Amino acid sequence: MKNTLRVAITFCAATAAAAADVAHAQARGPAAQYWVDLSTSNVSIPGMPEEGGAGLGGLMGGNSFGGSMGMGGRGKAMDTELYVRAHPGGVEGTHAIPGGMNMGPSLLLLPHRPRNEQGSVTRDETPERAEKPKGRILLYWGCGDSIRPGQPKVLDFAKQDHAEFAQFFSSHGAASKGVQGRAGHSLWPNERDSKRVPDNASLEGEHAVSGNGVPPTLKFNVGAANDFLPKVQLKTRGAPKDGVQVEWNTMQHARGYFLHAQGAAEGPGGAQDMIFWSSSEKPDNGWSLMSYQSPAQVARLVQQKVVLPPSTGNCTVPKGIFDKAQGAMLNMIAYGNELNVSHPPRPEKAPANWQPEWTARVRIKSTGMTMLGMEESREAQRDGRGQAASEPVESAAPVSLPDVANPVKLLKGLFGN
């Protein structure tokens, strides 16, 4: 009896210890996590040169972290981020890259140390109180020749209804976790390695990440399906008052497309109306969808007709939406694949206590931007309606982008931070 009791106690103790080890391992997480974000950007605006290095980004000189996050540039961008569990303050690391990147044998990863700017500058003046925005937001959606019944959806800033604002700005987007530039993580590009990603760069091939505390097995292969997407080439035809036909190049490895346009016009009482339109079959302000989405999320959105299928190559912005707008900007995003790698590889039926030694994720997108209605005016010039056909079209100064506020910033202005 005593032996049986002793065995039972020993078994219970061992089970408890094993459970504690599992819980501890789960709390620790992988020894290293690596994220890579790839982005291809293109801008098609009359007056802006089609070539010229890095496009809009090239005007700033050099390469800086965060290039894959925004829009409005031209060319390829890549951001990487490394987290090492044993060194939460960050480590100096190396990312060995394939020759097809045309950027040398490796990239340098440096710990991110955010600058504490608070208190660095003394100001005597009292901060001005932010002025409450005025006017309305008009929301349209759907491809087609005509505006659909029940549109637009209108939000009046004068009401300042929290519930209405929250409902109006809700979106179908749910970006997957990737590069964020977190403190203590090691990043590329950085102040010591700011090479630009060339237009002919390819991520295909073997990659290896090393550094203090990084497992020597952190190596992975990138195939063609997880390489940079081609650039979005937008072509528009027609004026906003008649409807604008938009065409683009379909992409082999794209999972779906989403278009979003915005403009501004004078509304009632002289206040400014902001006008939003998206290619979705359901109302969506579009802001959260203009970023990386996981393939599973994109598949759901295609099924819900929020995102256009990858075989789609055209869409018409209905007539009359932007006919009174003081310039309208059209943005498009092509969602790419997502590569998720771990070591050891995740089993099909992984137990609850399964824990990889390291993980790596590569996200891919391609974005394009153009001005609605400007393509027609350029064709008019070439056809002789604006000037003689034999007369060369002079390069105009770059067209300024319409100053349309971000809804998130508007919400902060209305309800505070």
For the regions a language model picked out, list residue spans one by one:
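Bacterial N-terminal signal peptides that target proteins for export
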Residues: 1-9
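Sec/Tat signal peptide C-region and signal peptidase I cleavage site
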Residues: 18-25
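Solvent-exposed N-terminal domain segments of exported/luminal and surface proteins
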Residues: 28-191
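Short, aromatic- and glycine-rich surface loops/edge beta-strands on solvent-exposed regions
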Residues: 194-216, 325-339
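Proline/serine/threonine-rich low-complexity linkers at boundaries of modular beta-sandwich domains
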Residues: 216-228
